From Swiss-Prot:
HAMAP family (alphabetical): FadJ (MF_01617)
Encoding gene, per UniProt annotation: fadJ
Family of the protein in this entry: In the N-terminal section; belongs to the enoyl-CoA hydratase/isomerase family. In the central section; belongs to the 3-hydroxyacyl-CoA dehydrogenase family.
Protein name per its UniProtKB record: Fatty acid oxidation complex subunit alpha
One GO-annotated biological process of the protein: fatty acid beta-oxidation
Annotated pathway: Lipid metabolism; fatty acid beta-oxidation
Annotated site residues (Important for catalytic activity) in this chain: E119, E141
Biological source species: Vibrio cholerae serotype O1 (strain ATCC 39315 / El Tor Inaba N16961)
Amino acid sequence: MDNNNAFQLSFDEQHYAWLAIDVPGEKMNTLQAAFAEEMQAVFATLNEKRGQIKGLIIHSLKPDNFIAGADVRMLEACQSVHEAQALASQGQQMFQQLADLPFPVVAAIHGPCLGGGLELALACDYRVCTEDEVTRLGLPEVMLGLLPGSGGTQRLPRLIGLLPALDLILTGKQLRAKKAKKLGVVDACVPHSVLLDVAKRLLEEKGHKKRAQVTLPIKEKLLANTDLGRKLIFDQAAKKTQQKTRGNYPAAQAILEVIQYGLEKGMHAGLEYEAKRFAELVMTRESKALRSIFFATTEMKKDLGADAKPAPVAAVGVLGGGLMGAGISHVTVAKAKTSVRIKDVANDGVLNALNYNYKLFDKQRQRKILTKAQLQAQMSQLSGGTGFVGFDRCDVVIEAVFEDLKLKQQMVADIEANAKPTTIFATNTSSLPIHQIASQAQRPQNIVGLHYFSPVEKMPLVEVIPHATTSDETIATVVTLARKQGKTPIVVKDCAGFYVNRILAPYMNEAAQVLMAGEPIEKLDAALLDFGFPVGPITLLDEVGVDIGAKIMPILVKELGPRFQGPDVFDVLLKDNRKGRKSGKGFYTYKGSKKKEVDKSVYKLLKLTPESKLNDKEIAMRCLLPMLNEAVRCLDEGIIRSARDGDMGAIFGIGFPPFLGGPFRYMDTLGLTKVVEMMNQHTEKYGERFAPCDGLLTRAGLGEKFYP
């Protein structure tokens, strides 16, 4: 067969067929519509030799991936539901031909087996995967606002049962090998070195027979195979899905309907309905926005932030053993696979960071992600003390001490005195300008901002902030390190609040204005949850800490002007020791594991009588418009380099609703004329803080958009 083909068919002396997948010129195997002709030739050969073939083994020639999924770029070419449906039907037909082969087929999986890759594997009789860390199996289409469109919604429930299949498809979660084996997604997980041998042996052990129908557990039969049981499962799933998505993600409801339809009407009807609903989702605004995030994150993986080669990083130092320092040390060891030396003024601080790491690793051990030996190996990469021992080996030192300019300047001096001349000093400040921190440095070219978000091990964004004389190599090195830590880095200009806090502040200020106008706290939070944010603004303030807000806001007012001046609530709250969750009370009460409730006494403290006057949409738009306005200012001032970076920063930094694609894509969707119109209406009603900025007015006047 042509070596330029993605699918290469061969036969061994024992009459086994081997189908190797290797997409030419690509690092990852993806499925493309253009391969249909190749696959038809493969099926023709297999059917022609059907009487001689004992079985077929499908495997990848890529060193670290099976099939990462269908090529999402194909969907961008679809101009109609009809075209998208034809694409899904083509994939279904190809996998059905695989399932209909007269001899058994086994998929030998190493590395990611996702989306269309897993759907291909599900069409096989058997599946064997490696137990390597790189091996992951899942159907993540829901993350793109889609459903599995090549048979996944029909085959997975029939293989592993309805309940576990719903969990996998609705969440898009990826399974490690052992979990996949436990659920029955794969028949065996083995060392990589014997993968192909075991796959072939499995066919021999099965007597070269097609797989019989899977026998599901009694509980699954009672629940999923009876009308009453199915109704109960789907009703509960719909209720939970609505609570989680608040109706903002149509793919979740479509997944439930397609799976239910297939179980009730049969496989053939289920596949037809799957293709239809898949196609409808492809054309939705939500899926287009979610796909734009996928493309942006893929592009950003190639972006080093500067035109320079990153320096190698073999060891990292962390200054400060508090929550941020502990989190930074964790992602450096766990994700970046780099050793860390922690320094704190007190031994207790170092012990706190080590204990924090141990607890996170031990959770992984309890979930059988790590063995005890692997946990110990991870912890051996962490060390610390109250002095600078070991800092002479650090290539990067990340500072996570208190937000105090003189203290941070002292940290710069200490590292310049105790580390290599080439050591990069990265400051995790959330509000102080980087050029001020670097103002007394001997080597200012090595200093850069690296703003993480809390909790570090969960929040995906990091802002990289060079000052005027930061070297390109420094930028490229910390961008690369951040990416290895599992983060999405965006390079932003050195200015008060940087990007994320600068667009968050007007949003939070307006939420406070709405609150001080008498809107009930729970109504205000619920309105933004319904709009699509992961938490409401008042809950967010409680989680971040009222004291943190009280520190950041005056800096923004001083540096950027009176539009950042919010209602004076911080002092009143702090005098009553209301810092939020950390002090046990804020706007909500926090008592043990009991569900948080609004602390009604806060109304009296703020001299308010709660009364709902606005509807949810009015509340949401009041809070959102100042954020949109500030995002445009940031773009025009060069704080962010592109609308893409602004959208990614908002989504990954503050949880801007992903299904809207970010503030800039959302404004494009609304139309800039409409955005300006809404801002003018709010200006008349609430004041000059809503006045649209020049950049918005100009673009709206010219009929421009942020994206082509």
